[in-house]
């Protein structure tokens, strides 16, 4: 029996799925993978010979969101192992610094809009060590998972929200993942993260 809950996203844009705290990333990925495969299949245009043609139009976009340390990256990695042909984009790669959650969400919205309109996209990578923008990274036209705090802001075919396991658990996971470099910024980031509207 599924532990996932489903609801229509306002405006009929897509479907929102909530992953409960009690469901691990591998179990959630196993349940979600067939839905992603179906989305990719629906968007693959057929050639005149009845074979799938190379995508030249809109591609599906799936977003994974949840508060910092909730398991977004882990779920994205688990899904990527189960579905072929999907690229995974991480908002961590383009947030412009520790105060950049809103700007990162804007970039996610733009990338999703480009891909859903059948256009390749790009973003400027953020150099966390030097606190500056880095290289421009191309985002090819391919089925895409966008994960990170603020990803829910982008219009998507499927929006995945990971339920909050509680601040202590999230902080523990985030610091285990990012080390002590994140520790002095935890509250600063949490204020943005918890203060944002979650649709």
Predicted regions and their residues:
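Conserved lysine of the Walker
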Residues: 72
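ATP-dependent NMP and nucleoside kinases share a basic, alpha-helical "lid"
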Residues: 135-177
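Small-molecule kinase domains that catalyze NTP-dependent phosphoryl transfer to phosphate-bearing small molecules
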Residues: 4, 179-199
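P-loop (Walker A) phosphate-binding loop of NTP-binding proteins
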Residues: 67
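Charged, amphipathic alpha-helical linker segments immediately N-terminal to NTP-binding catalytic cores
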Residues: 1-27
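Conserved nucleotide-sensing/catalytic segment adjacent to the nucleotide-binding pocket
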Residues: 87-146
């Amino acid at each position: 029996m599924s532990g996932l809950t489903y609801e229509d996203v306002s405006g009929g844009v897509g479907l929102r799925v909530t992953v409960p705290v009690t469901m691990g990333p591998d179990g959630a990925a196993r349940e979600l993978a067939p839905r992603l495969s179906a989305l990719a299949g629906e968007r693959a245009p057929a050639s005149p010979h009845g074979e799938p043609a190379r995508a030249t139009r809109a591609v599906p976009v799936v977003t994974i969101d949840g508060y910092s340390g909730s398991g977004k990256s882990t779920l994205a990695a688990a899904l990527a192992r189960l579905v072929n042909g999907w690229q995974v984009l991480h908002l961590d790669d383009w947030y412009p610094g520790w105060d950049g959650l809103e700007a990162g969400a804007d970039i996610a919205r733009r990338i999703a809009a480009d891909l859903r309109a059948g256009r390749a996209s790009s973003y400027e990578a953020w150099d966390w060590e030097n606190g500056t923008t880095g290289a421009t990274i191309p985002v090819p036209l391919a089925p895409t998972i966008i994960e990170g705090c603020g990803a829910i802001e982008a219009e998507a075919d499927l929006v995945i929200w990971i339920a909050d396991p509680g601040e202590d658990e999230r902080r523990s996971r985030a610091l285990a993942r990012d080390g002590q470099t994140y520790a002095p910024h935890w509250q600063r980031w949490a204020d943005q993260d918890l203060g944002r509207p979650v649709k």
